[in-house]
């Protein structure tokens, strides 16, 4: 009896494994055909190695898809086990799955030709179109009936081959003589391995696997799109759409926005935000630099720079730069959001966090906002570039930055292919090396740099990089001296600190007429204290260094957030009368900063919900005026929300 049960189980386990292999191979073959059939979209410098990289990464990612399709087939297998005649239901299941898979594959060709992308959010846009007109267009322009017929014929052949493959018994003598128990254990182990690889996209954990967000590892847009099979592309479209729909922003009336804009800017711009946000430079404070680098550093919190933690020695290198005469540093700075994407959106658009997912919003992908960074730096004569250590597909970063006016975008695919790194991107040293090699002294250049090394999975070979763990251990509290995970995290902060300072010093030596702005993208990841103060937990440093910078160029009581960084840069370098647009203000006059949940001054920090009711002091016990603080917080949020969703004209009708 047991042997009979095991025999039946083994037959089903074998079918599951065969199904997985068949679907995975089919997805891989479809990918190869797509790359071959659309090879004209390959960039000129995409060689065989890059194509093989895309094929390999796509094969890993399709393990996940194959697992999902195999789970769908379980319905048919279970039905057939209950009653043998229900095998015809299994045939129907396989036909439906193969039909959808093949139909998507065929549809991908015209979709890419039209949109230069795999399936994306245009699928959801199409739902709001005239469906009848869309259907007629598909029939007339894309020969829908003929292509459907071809798909049905191809699927019939594939379905026949699939079911023959399931029924075929491989005659392996050594396998046949094994006891059924051994076969069961072996097959279960095989299913476990395939299931794990499927779950993590070709890896043993999320750290080594591939998913749709980190798949864009080449510098070829077409190859990055080919890595995603059609199901993964549709999931990407769905995920981005859900993010966008979940982030409808705040809620202000048109009159609220007008009143808050007046309060924030002391102007009466009527219904035109461009009037409220326009600013005029008073004249350059320093000689216009040839090259400007804005380094947005992953998880670079301010607390390691405090004297309180100097015995850890994890921020010594940036401290040396801070100590130099040509450097300004403030700790009275807040990030826009709690994650990297918040900093990305603010540094690119100049707008505060208003619960809008700008990287995927159609409005943000159509034209640059008037407050966008890149167009305003281009007006000052700079060629603008955005550098990201990770894949071009993360958070739609390539499309977003280019749509917001950057001349160039560089990502993992533009960095040494042999560079070490993690699933998030190349290690910082390779990122900075690629940027250094790209500097063209015949041009005025402006570069925003977003690194990734100070981020889990924390897999850098710190010993090889020269990290002395004993120094950190010596400075840790006794209860943390054996906390290897914390030591590794602090080691990665040390690495990010060292690589940034090395880059700054190297560029200064060769290109002395350069300006550097260094800021953490966010804090709040790890602290020594289990219950850190708000100031230690949430503040990030702002460091401005380079030719012409003097420590008294900005006031000591300045305070702000990431919306104030670019106005500060423009205020330092722009000629008198230069007009620019910003939600934030230059730190030469700004004394307040706000983020997604907090406010800060040169003396105190608090929660935006509580305003001045529950402050924490880190300097003098001085608080901002409650009404001024409330209007400031609401003002930058309301303006950013309206500008992000509706543009510059304040009109109640747009809310309908």
Explain the meaning of each model-derived region.
Residues 126-129, 229, 244, 252, ...:
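Short coil/turn linker and secondary-structure boundary residues
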Residues 2-247:
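Transmembrane and membrane-interface helices of multi-pass
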Residues 26, 128-132, 228-231, 254-258, ...:
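Alpha-helix initiation and N-capping motif
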């Amino acid at each position: 009896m047991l042997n009979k049960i095991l025999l039946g189980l083994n037959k089903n386990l074998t079918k599951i494994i065969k199904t997985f292999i068949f679907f995975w191979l089919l997805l891989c073959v479809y990918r190869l055909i797509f790359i071959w059939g659309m090879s004209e979209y390959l960039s000129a410098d995409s060689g065989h190695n890059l194509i093989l990289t895309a094929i390999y990464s796509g094969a890993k990612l399709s393990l996940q898809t194959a697992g999902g399709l195999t789970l769908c087939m379980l319905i048919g297998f279970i039905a057939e086990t209950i009653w043998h005649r229900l095998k015809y239901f299994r045939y129907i299941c396989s036909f439906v799955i193969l039909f959808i898979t093949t139909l998507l594959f065929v549809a991908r060709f015209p979709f890419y030709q039209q949109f230069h992308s795999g399936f994306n959010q245009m699928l959801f846009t199409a739902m709001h179109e005239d469906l009848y007109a869309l259907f007629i267009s598909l029939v007339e322009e894309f020969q829908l009936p003929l292509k459907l017929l071809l798909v049905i014929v191809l699927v019939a052949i594939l379905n026949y081959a699939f079911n023959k493959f399931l029924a075929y018994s491989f005659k392996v003598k050594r396998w046949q003589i094994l006891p059924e128990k051994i076969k069961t254990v072996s097959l279960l182990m095989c299913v476990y391995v395939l299931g794990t690889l499927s779950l993590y996209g070709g890896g043993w954990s999320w750290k080594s696997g591939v998913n749709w967000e980190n798949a864009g590892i080449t510098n070829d847009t077409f190859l990055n799109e080919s890595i995603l099979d059609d199901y993964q592309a549709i999931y990407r479209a769905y995920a981005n759409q859900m993010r966008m729909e979940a982030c409808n922003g705040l809620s202000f009336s048109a009159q609220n926005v007008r009143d808050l804009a007046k309060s924030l800017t002391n102007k009466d711009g009527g219904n035109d935000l461009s009037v409220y946000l326009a600013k005029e430079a008073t004249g350059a404070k320093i000689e216009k630099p040839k090259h400007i680098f804005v380094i947005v550093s992953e998880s670079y919190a301010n607390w390691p720079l405090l004297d309180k933690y100097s015995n850890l020695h994890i921020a010594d290198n940036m401290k040396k730069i801070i100590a130099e005469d040509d450097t300004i540093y403030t700790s009275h700075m807040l990030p826009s959001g709690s994650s990297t994407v918040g900093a990305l959106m603010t540094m690119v658009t100049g707008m505060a966090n208003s619960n809008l997912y700008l990287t995927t919003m159609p409005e943000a992908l159509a034209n640059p906002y008037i407050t966008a960074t890149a167009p305003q730096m281009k007006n000052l004569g700079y060629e603008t570039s955005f550098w990201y250590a990770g894949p071009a597909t993360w958070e739609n970063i390539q499309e977003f930055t280019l749509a917001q006016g950057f001349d160039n975008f560089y990502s993992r695919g533009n960095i040494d292919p042999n560079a070490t790194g993690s699933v998030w991107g190349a290690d910082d040293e390779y990122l900075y090396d690629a940027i250094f090699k790209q500097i063209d002294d015949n041009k005025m250049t402006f570069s925003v740099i977003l690194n990734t090394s100070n981020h889990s999975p924390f897999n850098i070979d710190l010993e090889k990089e020269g990290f002395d763990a004993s120094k950190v251990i010596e400075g840790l509290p006794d209860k943390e001296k054996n906390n290897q995970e914390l030591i590794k995290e602090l080691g990665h902060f040390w690495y990010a600190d060292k690589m940034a300072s090395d880059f700054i010093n190297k560029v200064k030596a060769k290109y002395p007429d350069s300006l550097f702005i260094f800021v953490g993208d966010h804090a709040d990841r790890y602290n020594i204290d289990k219950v850190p103060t708000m100031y230690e937990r949430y503040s990030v440093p702002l460091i401005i260094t380079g030719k012409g910078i003097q420590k008294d160029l900005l006031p000591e009581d300045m305070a702000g957030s990431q919306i104030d960084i670019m106005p500060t840069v423009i205020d330092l370098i722009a000629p008198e009368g230069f007009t620019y647009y910003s939600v934030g203000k230059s730190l030469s006059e700004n004394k307040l900063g706000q983020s997604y949940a907090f406010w800060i001054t040169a003396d105190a920090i608090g929660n935006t919900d509580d305003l001045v009711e529950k402050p924490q002091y880190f300097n003098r016990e001085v608080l901002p005026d409650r009404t001024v603080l409330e209007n400031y917080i609401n003002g930058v949020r309301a303006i950013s929300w309206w500008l992000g969703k509706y543009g510059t004209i304040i009109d109640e009708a747009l809310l309908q």
